[in-house]
Amino acid sequence: MIRFENVTKRYPDGTTAVHDLSLEVAEGELVTLVGPSGCGKTTTMKMVNRLIEPTSGRILLDGEDISAVDPVELRRRIGYVIQQVGLFPHKTVLDNTATVPYLLGWPKARRRARAAELLDLVGLDPTRFGDRYPDQLSGGQRQRVGVARALAADPPVLLMDEPFGAVDPVVREHLQNEFLRLQSTLHKTVLFVTHDIEEAVRLGDRIAVYGDGRIEQFDPPAKVLGAPATPYVADFVGADRGLKRLSVTPIEKGDLEQPPVVHLDDPLEAARARMRGEGSRWAVVLDDADELHGWLSADAAGDGLADGPDRPATVRDHARRMEAWLPLGSPLKQAFSSMLQHDAGWVAVLDDADRFVGVLTPSRLHEALRRSIDADERDVRRDEVELETVADA
Protein backbone atom coordinates (compact mmCIF):
# COMPACT_ATOMS: atom_id res chain seq x y z
CA MET A 1 0.00 0.00 0.00
CA ILE A 2 1.20 3.53 -0.84
CA ARG A 3 -0.28 6.52 0.98
CA PHE A 4 0.37 10.21 0.39
CA GLU A 5 -0.67 12.46 3.28
CA ASN A 6 -0.86 16.19 2.42
CA VAL A 7 2.30 16.00 0.31
CA THR A 8 3.64 19.16 -1.32
CA LYS A 9 6.75 19.61 -3.45
CA ARG A 10 7.96 23.18 -3.84
CA TYR A 11 11.26 24.08 -5.54
CA PRO A 12 13.60 26.90 -4.45
CA ASP A 13 12.45 29.12 -7.33
CA GLY A 14 8.91 29.02 -5.92
CA THR A 15 7.50 26.51 -8.41
CA THR A 16 5.06 24.12 -6.75
CA ALA A 17 5.07 20.83 -8.63
CA VAL A 18 2.65 19.00 -6.32
CA HIS A 19 0.03 20.73 -4.15
CA ASP A 20 -1.16 19.14 -0.88
CA LEU A 21 -1.59 15.66 -2.34
CA SER A 22 -3.51 13.01 -0.42
CA LEU A 23 -3.81 9.71 -2.25
CA GLU A 24 -3.87 6.01 -1.41
CA VAL A 25 -2.97 3.08 -3.65
CA ALA A 26 -4.34 -0.15 -2.22
CA GLU A 27 -2.29 -3.34 -2.06
CA GLY A 28 -2.39 -5.08 -5.44
CA GLU A 29 -3.95 -2.07 -7.18
CA LEU A 30 -2.68 -0.48 -10.39
CA VAL A 31 -3.18 3.29 -10.36
CA THR A 32 -2.34 5.33 -13.43
CA LEU A 33 -1.24 8.95 -13.05
CA VAL A 34 -2.15 10.77 -16.24
CA GLY A 35 -1.82 14.33 -17.41
CA PRO A 36 0.13 16.65 -19.71
CA SER A 37 3.85 17.35 -19.39
CA GLY A 38 4.74 19.35 -16.30
CA CYS A 39 1.59 18.52 -14.35
CA GLY A 40 3.40 16.82 -11.43
CA LYS A 41 2.73 13.16 -12.12
CA THR A 42 6.37 12.08 -12.47
CA THR A 43 7.36 14.19 -9.47
CA THR A 44 4.70 12.36 -7.47
CA MET A 45 6.09 8.99 -8.47
CA LYS A 46 9.73 9.93 -7.82
CA MET A 47 8.89 11.00 -4.29
CA VAL A 48 7.93 7.38 -3.52
CA ASN A 49 11.50 6.11 -4.00
CA ARG A 50 13.00 9.38 -2.77
CA LEU A 51 14.61 10.40 -6.03
CA ILE A 52 12.81 13.63 -5.15
CA GLU A 53 12.17 14.65 -1.54
CA PRO A 54 8.83 16.24 -0.61
CA THR A 55 8.76 19.70 0.91
CA SER A 56 6.05 18.75 3.37
CA GLY A 57 3.67 15.93 4.17
CA ARG A 58 4.28 12.20 4.56
CA ILE A 59 4.51 9.19 2.26
CA LEU A 60 3.85 5.78 3.78
CA LEU A 61 4.81 2.45 2.26
CA ASP A 62 2.90 -0.39 3.92
CA GLY A 63 2.37 1.89 6.90
CA GLU A 64 6.03 2.91 7.24
CA ASP A 65 7.09 6.53 6.80
CA ILE A 66 9.65 6.37 4.00
CA SER A 67 11.53 9.42 5.32
CA ALA A 68 12.84 7.14 8.08
CA VAL A 69 14.16 4.55 5.61
CA ASP A 70 17.62 4.70 4.04
CA PRO A 71 17.04 5.77 0.39
CA VAL A 72 19.28 3.04 -1.05
CA GLU A 73 17.56 0.34 0.99
CA LEU A 74 14.16 1.78 0.03
CA ARG A 75 14.94 1.66 -3.70
CA ARG A 76 15.99 -1.97 -3.48
CA ARG A 77 12.52 -2.73 -2.12
CA ILE A 78 10.75 -1.01 -5.00
CA GLY A 79 10.70 -2.05 -8.66
CA TYR A 80 11.38 0.83 -11.07
CA VAL A 81 10.77 0.85 -14.83
CA ILE A 82 11.49 3.90 -16.99
CA GLN A 83 10.91 4.79 -20.62
CA GLN A 84 14.61 4.71 -21.51
CA VAL A 85 14.88 1.28 -19.79
CA GLY A 86 18.38 2.07 -18.49
CA LEU A 87 19.99 -1.32 -19.09
CA PHE A 88 23.75 -1.58 -18.53
CA PRO A 89 25.25 -1.85 -22.04
CA HIS A 90 28.27 -3.89 -20.87
CA LYS A 91 26.17 -6.54 -19.11
CA THR A 92 24.26 -9.45 -20.59
CA VAL A 93 20.49 -9.65 -20.45
CA LEU A 94 20.71 -12.24 -17.67
CA ASP A 95 23.06 -10.09 -15.59
CA ASN A 96 20.97 -6.96 -16.18
CA THR A 97 17.91 -8.80 -14.95
CA ALA A 98 19.75 -9.98 -11.83
CA THR A 99 20.95 -6.46 -10.87
CA VAL A 100 18.93 -6.02 -7.66
CA PRO A 101 19.42 -9.60 -6.41
CA TYR A 102 23.17 -9.00 -6.94
CA LEU A 103 23.03 -5.81 -4.86
CA LEU A 104 21.09 -7.67 -2.18
CA GLY A 105 23.86 -10.26 -1.97
CA TRP A 106 22.01 -13.26 -3.36
CA PRO A 107 24.24 -16.25 -4.26
CA LYS A 108 25.13 -16.36 -7.94
CA ALA A 109 23.19 -19.53 -8.71
CA ARG A 110 20.05 -18.19 -7.04
CA ARG A 111 20.11 -14.83 -8.79
CA ARG A 112 20.77 -16.36 -12.21
CA ALA A 113 17.95 -18.85 -11.72
CA ARG A 114 15.65 -15.99 -10.69
CA ALA A 115 16.71 -13.92 -13.72
CA ALA A 116 16.01 -16.84 -16.06
CA GLU A 117 12.60 -17.35 -14.43
CA LEU A 118 11.68 -13.67 -14.91
CA LEU A 119 12.86 -13.57 -18.52
CA ASP A 120 10.66 -16.54 -19.25
CA LEU A 121 7.77 -14.81 -17.46
CA VAL A 122 8.01 -11.74 -19.72
CA GLY A 123 8.21 -13.85 -22.88
CA LEU A 124 11.97 -13.97 -23.51
CA ASP A 125 13.52 -17.43 -23.69
CA PRO A 126 16.56 -17.22 -21.36
CA THR A 127 18.44 -19.80 -23.44
CA ARG A 128 18.11 -17.52 -26.50
CA PHE A 129 18.33 -14.07 -24.96
CA GLY A 130 20.18 -14.51 -21.66
CA ASP A 131 23.69 -14.10 -23.11
CA ARG A 132 22.83 -11.24 -25.46
CA TYR A 133 23.66 -7.60 -24.80
CA PRO A 134 21.13 -4.75 -24.84
CA ASP A 135 22.22 -3.46 -28.26
CA GLN A 136 21.34 -6.88 -29.71
CA LEU A 137 17.67 -6.50 -28.70
CA SER A 138 14.73 -4.67 -30.23
CA GLY A 139 13.07 -1.81 -28.34
CA GLY A 140 10.24 -4.04 -27.21
CA GLN A 141 12.65 -6.74 -26.02
CA ARG A 142 14.69 -4.20 -24.04
CA GLN A 143 11.50 -2.98 -22.39
CA ARG A 144 10.63 -6.55 -21.40
CA VAL A 145 14.06 -6.92 -19.81
CA GLY A 146 13.41 -3.69 -17.91
CA VAL A 147 10.19 -5.11 -16.49
CA ALA A 148 11.91 -8.41 -15.62
CA ARG A 149 14.69 -6.53 -13.82
CA ALA A 150 12.15 -4.54 -11.81
CA LEU A 151 10.46 -7.77 -10.71
CA ALA A 152 13.63 -9.76 -9.99
CA ALA A 153 13.69 -9.29 -6.21
CA ASP A 154 9.90 -9.71 -6.00
CA PRO A 155 9.19 -6.19 -4.72
CA PRO A 156 5.64 -5.51 -3.50
CA VAL A 157 5.62 -2.10 -5.23
CA LEU A 158 6.35 -1.14 -8.84
CA LEU A 159 6.91 2.39 -10.14
CA MET A 160 6.55 2.69 -13.91
CA ASP A 161 7.36 5.98 -15.63
CA GLU A 162 5.95 5.89 -19.19
CA PRO A 163 7.59 2.48 -19.70
CA PHE A 164 6.01 1.83 -23.10
CA GLY A 165 6.25 5.34 -24.51
CA ALA A 166 9.35 4.83 -26.67
CA VAL A 167 8.10 1.91 -28.81
CA ASP A 168 5.82 1.86 -31.84
CA PRO A 169 2.03 1.51 -31.35
CA VAL A 170 1.85 -2.18 -32.30
CA VAL A 171 4.64 -3.18 -29.90
CA ARG A 172 3.18 -0.87 -27.27
CA GLU A 173 -0.20 -2.59 -27.34
CA HIS A 174 1.48 -5.98 -27.12
CA LEU A 175 3.55 -4.88 -24.12
CA GLN A 176 0.43 -3.50 -22.44
CA ASN A 177 -1.32 -6.84 -22.93
CA GLU A 178 1.68 -8.71 -21.54
CA PHE A 179 1.87 -6.45 -18.51
CA LEU A 180 -1.85 -6.88 -17.78
CA ARG A 181 -1.30 -10.63 -17.95
CA LEU A 182 1.59 -10.39 -15.49
CA GLN A 183 -0.35 -8.13 -13.13
CA SER A 184 -3.31 -10.52 -13.09
CA THR A 185 -0.92 -13.15 -11.73
CA LEU A 186 1.47 -11.11 -9.56
CA HIS A 187 -0.92 -8.50 -8.07
CA LYS A 188 1.76 -5.88 -7.48
CA THR A 189 0.96 -2.43 -6.10
CA VAL A 190 1.69 -0.21 -9.10
CA LEU A 191 2.00 3.51 -9.76
CA PHE A 192 2.04 3.93 -13.54
CA VAL A 193 2.78 7.34 -15.09
CA THR A 194 1.55 8.14 -18.60
CA HIS A 195 0.47 11.13 -20.66
CA ASP A 196 -1.83 8.93 -22.78
CA ILE A 197 -5.43 8.75 -21.54
CA GLU A 198 -6.09 5.62 -23.60
CA GLU A 199 -3.18 3.84 -21.91
CA ALA A 200 -4.41 5.04 -18.52
CA VAL A 201 -7.91 3.73 -19.24
CA ARG A 202 -6.62 0.43 -20.57
CA LEU A 203 -4.30 -0.37 -17.66
CA GLY A 204 -5.57 1.38 -14.56
CA ASP A 205 -7.82 0.02 -11.84
CA ARG A 206 -8.18 3.69 -10.97
CA ILE A 207 -6.99 6.83 -12.74
CA ALA A 208 -5.64 9.99 -11.13
CA VAL A 209 -6.04 12.84 -13.64
CA TYR A 210 -3.46 15.54 -12.92
CA GLY A 211 -3.71 19.23 -13.70
CA ASP A 212 -1.13 21.77 -12.55
CA GLY A 213 0.10 19.72 -9.61
CA ARG A 214 -3.34 18.77 -8.34
CA ILE A 215 -5.54 15.74 -8.83
CA GLU A 216 -8.64 16.82 -10.71
CA GLN A 217 -10.28 13.39 -10.47
CA PHE A 218 -9.41 10.02 -8.94
CA ASP A 219 -11.83 7.32 -10.01
CA PRO A 220 -12.17 4.04 -11.93
CA PRO A 221 -11.73 4.46 -15.71
CA ALA A 222 -15.44 4.07 -16.51
CA LYS A 223 -16.35 6.90 -14.14
CA VAL A 224 -13.62 9.21 -15.45
CA LEU A 225 -14.96 8.66 -18.96
CA GLY A 226 -18.64 8.70 -18.05
CA ALA A 227 -18.72 11.45 -15.47
CA PRO A 228 -15.73 13.83 -15.72
CA ALA A 229 -15.46 15.71 -12.42
CA THR A 230 -14.37 19.03 -13.93
CA PRO A 231 -14.29 20.78 -17.31
CA TYR A 232 -10.52 20.19 -17.30
CA VAL A 233 -11.02 16.42 -17.05
CA ALA A 234 -13.70 16.46 -19.76
CA ASP A 235 -11.36 18.37 -22.07
CA PHE A 236 -8.39 16.12 -21.28
CA VAL A 237 -10.36 12.91 -21.81
CA GLY A 238 -11.63 14.23 -25.15
CA ALA A 239 -14.90 14.54 -27.01
CA ASP A 240 -14.75 10.89 -28.06
CA ARG A 241 -14.91 9.59 -24.49
CA GLY A 242 -18.04 7.63 -25.45
CA LEU A 243 -15.86 5.54 -27.76
CA LYS A 244 -13.18 5.22 -25.09
CA ARG A 245 -15.81 3.68 -22.80
CA LEU A 246 -15.79 0.66 -25.10
CA SER A 247 -12.30 -0.10 -23.74
CA VAL A 248 -13.47 -0.37 -20.13
CA THR A 249 -16.91 -1.96 -20.51
CA PRO A 250 -16.65 -5.77 -20.40
CA ILE A 251 -18.78 -8.29 -22.25
CA GLU A 252 -21.13 -9.90 -19.73
CA LYS A 253 -23.20 -13.03 -20.13
CA GLY A 254 -26.43 -11.04 -19.98
CA ASP A 255 -25.33 -9.06 -23.06
CA LEU A 256 -25.35 -12.12 -25.31
CA GLU A 257 -27.91 -13.52 -27.72
CA GLN A 258 -28.53 -17.25 -28.01
CA PRO A 259 -28.67 -18.32 -31.67
CA PRO A 260 -29.57 -21.83 -32.85
CA VAL A 261 -26.79 -24.31 -32.10
CA VAL A 262 -26.08 -27.36 -34.27
CA HIS A 263 -23.33 -29.98 -34.42
CA LEU A 264 -21.01 -31.00 -37.23
CA ASP A 265 -22.61 -34.39 -37.80
CA ASP A 266 -26.23 -33.21 -37.64
CA PRO A 267 -28.16 -33.78 -40.90
CA LEU A 268 -28.21 -30.58 -42.91
CA GLU A 269 -31.98 -30.64 -43.29
CA ALA A 270 -32.42 -31.00 -39.53
CA ALA A 271 -30.14 -27.99 -38.99
CA ARG A 272 -32.13 -25.95 -41.51
CA ALA A 273 -35.35 -26.94 -39.77
CA ARG A 274 -33.95 -25.76 -36.44
CA MET A 275 -32.97 -22.41 -37.93
CA ARG A 276 -36.43 -21.99 -39.47
CA GLY A 277 -38.05 -22.93 -36.18
CA GLU A 278 -36.07 -20.27 -34.31
CA GLY A 279 -36.49 -17.66 -37.02
CA SER A 280 -32.77 -17.37 -37.70
CA ARG A 281 -30.78 -17.22 -40.94
CA TRP A 282 -27.72 -18.83 -39.37
CA ALA A 283 -26.59 -21.15 -36.58
CA VAL A 284 -23.47 -21.67 -34.50
CA VAL A 285 -21.71 -24.99 -35.16
CA LEU A 286 -20.08 -27.04 -32.39
CA ASP A 287 -17.89 -30.11 -32.81
CA ASP A 288 -18.29 -33.50 -31.13
CA ALA A 289 -16.68 -32.16 -27.95
CA ASP A 290 -19.12 -29.22 -27.87
CA GLU A 291 -16.31 -26.81 -28.73
CA LEU A 292 -16.82 -23.94 -31.15
CA HIS A 293 -16.17 -24.89 -34.78
CA GLY A 294 -17.87 -22.31 -36.96
CA TRP A 295 -21.24 -21.28 -38.29
CA LEU A 296 -23.83 -22.38 -40.82
CA SER A 297 -25.90 -20.20 -43.14
CA ALA A 298 -29.53 -21.07 -43.87
CA ASP A 299 -28.61 -20.47 -47.50
CA ALA A 300 -25.96 -23.22 -47.39
CA ALA A 301 -25.44 -24.54 -50.89
CA GLY A 302 -26.56 -28.01 -51.83
CA ASP A 303 -29.69 -30.02 -52.24
CA GLY A 304 -29.39 -31.94 -49.00
CA LEU A 305 -26.95 -34.43 -50.51
CA ALA A 306 -23.19 -34.72 -50.04
CA ASP A 307 -21.32 -37.07 -52.37
CA GLY A 308 -24.40 -38.55 -53.96
CA PRO A 309 -27.86 -39.89 -53.25
CA ASP A 310 -26.55 -42.52 -50.85
CA ARG A 311 -25.35 -40.08 -48.17
CA PRO A 312 -27.45 -37.17 -46.94
CA ALA A 313 -25.48 -33.99 -46.39
CA THR A 314 -24.48 -33.02 -42.87
CA VAL A 315 -23.64 -29.71 -41.29
CA ARG A 316 -19.96 -30.60 -41.70
CA ASP A 317 -20.33 -30.38 -45.50
CA HIS A 318 -21.43 -26.75 -45.42
CA ALA A 319 -20.17 -25.25 -42.14
CA ARG A 320 -17.78 -22.31 -42.29
CA ARG A 321 -14.90 -21.94 -39.88
CA MET A 322 -15.27 -19.27 -37.24
CA GLU A 323 -12.96 -16.34 -37.95
CA ALA A 324 -13.43 -14.43 -34.72
CA TRP A 325 -14.33 -15.11 -31.11
CA LEU A 326 -13.61 -13.48 -27.78
CA PRO A 327 -13.51 -14.59 -24.14
CA LEU A 328 -16.25 -13.46 -21.79
CA GLY A 329 -15.15 -10.28 -20.02
CA SER A 330 -13.30 -8.87 -23.04
CA PRO A 331 -13.77 -5.13 -23.61
CA LEU A 332 -16.60 -4.12 -25.92
CA LYS A 333 -13.97 -2.34 -28.01
CA GLN A 334 -12.47 -5.70 -29.01
CA ALA A 335 -15.88 -6.98 -30.06
CA PHE A 336 -16.58 -3.85 -32.09
CA SER A 337 -13.16 -4.05 -33.75
CA SER A 338 -13.65 -7.74 -34.55
CA MET A 339 -17.01 -7.10 -36.22
CA LEU A 340 -15.48 -4.35 -38.37
CA GLN A 341 -12.38 -6.37 -39.24
CA HIS A 342 -14.36 -9.43 -40.36
CA ASP A 343 -17.35 -7.52 -41.75
CA ALA A 344 -19.54 -9.57 -39.40
CA GLY A 345 -22.85 -8.85 -37.72
CA TRP A 346 -21.88 -10.69 -34.54
CA VAL A 347 -18.96 -12.19 -32.64
CA ALA A 348 -18.95 -15.49 -30.73
CA VAL A 349 -18.10 -15.42 -27.01
CA LEU A 350 -16.48 -18.23 -24.99
CA ASP A 351 -16.18 -18.75 -21.24
CA ASP A 352 -13.01 -19.54 -19.25
CA ALA A 353 -13.28 -23.21 -20.24
CA ASP A 354 -13.54 -22.27 -23.94
CA ARG A 355 -17.22 -23.24 -24.04
CA PHE A 356 -19.55 -21.30 -26.32
CA VAL A 357 -21.87 -19.05 -24.28
CA GLY A 358 -23.52 -16.82 -26.91
CA VAL A 359 -22.96 -14.10 -29.48
CA LEU A 360 -22.67 -10.34 -29.19
CA THR A 361 -24.47 -8.33 -31.88
CA PRO A 362 -24.25 -4.58 -32.60
CA SER A 363 -27.62 -3.96 -30.94
CA ARG A 364 -26.58 -5.89 -27.82
CA LEU A 365 -23.25 -4.03 -27.78
CA HIS A 366 -25.14 -0.74 -27.75
CA GLU A 367 -27.36 -1.98 -24.92
CA ALA A 368 -24.29 -3.01 -22.90
CA LEU A 369 -22.71 0.41 -23.36
CA ARG A 370 -25.96 2.11 -22.40
CA ARG A 371 -26.17 -0.04 -19.26
CA SER A 372 -22.66 1.03 -18.25
CA ILE A 373 -23.45 4.72 -18.79
CA ASP A 374 -26.69 4.46 -16.79
CA ALA A 375 -24.85 2.74 -13.92
CA ASP A 376 -22.26 5.53 -13.78
CA GLU A 377 -24.96 8.19 -13.84
CA ARG A 378 -26.65 6.48 -10.88
CA ASP A 379 -23.31 6.43 -9.03
CA VAL A 380 -22.83 10.15 -9.68
CA ARG A 381 -26.33 10.96 -8.40
CA ARG A 382 -25.71 8.83 -5.29
CA ASP A 383 -22.41 10.64 -4.64
CA GLU A 384 -24.13 14.01 -5.00
CA VAL A 385 -26.82 12.99 -2.50
CA GLU A 386 -24.17 11.79 -0.04
CA LEU A 387 -22.27 15.08 -0.35
CA GLU A 388 -25.48 17.07 0.21
CA THR A 389 -26.25 14.95 3.28
CA VAL A 390 -22.78 15.60 4.71
CA ALA A 391 -23.08 19.32 3.97
CA ASP A 392 -26.46 19.53 5.72
CA ALA A 393 -25.29 17.61 8.78
Feature-to-residue mapping (PLM):
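Helix-to-loop junction immediately C-terminal to a conserved catalytic motif
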Residues: 49
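ABC ATPase "signature
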Residues: 218-219, 227, 295, 359
